[in-house]
Amino acid sequence: MQNLPVTHYSALLAEKQEKLTALLAPFNAPNLQVFASPTQHFRMRAEFRIWHEGDDFYHIMFDQQSKQRYRVDNFPIASELINRMMTALLPLLKQQTVLHHRLFQIDYLSTQSQHIIVSLLYHKALDEDWQAAAQTLRSQLQQQGFNVQIVGRASKQKICLEQDYVDEILRVHGKDYIYRQVENSFTQPNATVNSKMLEWAVDCTRNSHGDLLELYCGNGNFSIALAQNFRKVLATEIAKPSVAAAQFNIAANQINNLQIIRMSAEEFTQAMQGVREFNRLKGIDLKAYECNTIFVDPPRAGLDADTVKLVQQYERILYISCNPHTLCDNLQTLSQTHRIEKAALFDQFPYTEHMEAGVWLVRKG
């Protein structure tokens, strides 16, 4: 991974386009819209194990085929900010034993707005000595011009020197949106391609009538940008830090038609069908929503059979998938009632087999 095959990028993307086109062919999908990535420095987060060798230590990764570890001194797929931090950080950690003793992993989360969180993970409890040393480390990095947050983590322990989040700014069709991103919770890794996904989703849902339901909304990445196209938006998310970030993002972007509820897709299905009542829904009148459109961005496993049935009840379905094979499994059912109006390939993960796909489905007839 040290030297990227930048000159082969276009050919590698064309291969993905062929593969996804073939996968979607049985469902009569229209021609793919293809959204390319920058060829380097596109990844806004990275995680590395730390290997100790005598008094020395360094970042390592593991080869996916051979499982052999290899040393990483620079990482061209990661943002330039992460690369600069990797170079600056290790010499400073080496100055203080309490900071590198039993350190086994470092996670980096950066933003286009030049903020970064460094998370230091340890096989030991963290005490006041660690905290004092970490404060010194942060000051040293700030003196080098870094806008940095430091988080220490150990078993059942987390210490934030100031905060455990960064605020990213993403541009969508010329408008800037603020997104709070919390350390150790999911965020889209490729900021440039994320903006393109948001723009595509906004374009698909333009001129929509009624309301939008989103399952698993995370920090509100999609629902905040999509709210402009709907009367009201109802979004579900199960992870507490993501819900808190989403609530901040709603306020920061002055969105007044988006309601987030903390429940799983399965629980939401039960609530909609009146199978059971939830205290979390007190004060929210589900009957006041006329959701004609549903948005889903499921994990790699795709949607389970019950959720597919729920999704099928909606007139229009916007489906973003990080695994086209499980997308196609779901389309076996969805294509019985819906047709694909638009399809897209988003190259979130250049130089890998991974493909991010989007389909916009409309009910037949």
UniProtKB/Swiss-Prot annotation:
Catalytic-site annotation from UniProt: 322, 356
Enzyme class (EC, first level): transferase
EC number: 2.1.1.-, 2.1.1.35
Binding-site list for S-adenosyl-L-methionine: 188, 216, 221, 237, 297
Higher taxonomy: Bacteria, Pseudomonadati, Pseudomonadota, Gammaproteobacteria, Pasteurellales
Function: Dual-specificity methyltransferase that catalyzes the formation of 5-methyluridine at position 54 (m5U54) in all tRNAs, and that of position 341 (m5U341) in tmRNA (transfer-mRNA).
Record-level GO cellular component terms: cytosol
Keyword Cytoplasm: no
Family per record: Belongs to the class I-like SAM-binding methyltransferase superfamily. RNA M5U methyltransferase family. TrmA subfamily.
Keyword field: Methyltransferase, S-adenosyl-L-methionine, Transferase, tRNA processing
Protein name: tRNA/tmRNA (uracil-C(5))-methyltransferase
Gene Ontology MF term list: rRNA binding; tRNA (uracil(54)-C5)-methyltransferase activity, S-adenosyl methionine-dependent; tRNA binding
Catalysed conversion reaction: uridine(54) in tRNA + S-adenosyl-L-methionine = 5-methyluridine(54) in tRNA + S-adenosyl-L-homocysteine + H(+); uridine(341) in tmRNA + S-adenosyl-L-methionine = 5-methyluridine(341) in tmRNA + S-adenosyl-L-homocysteine + H(+)
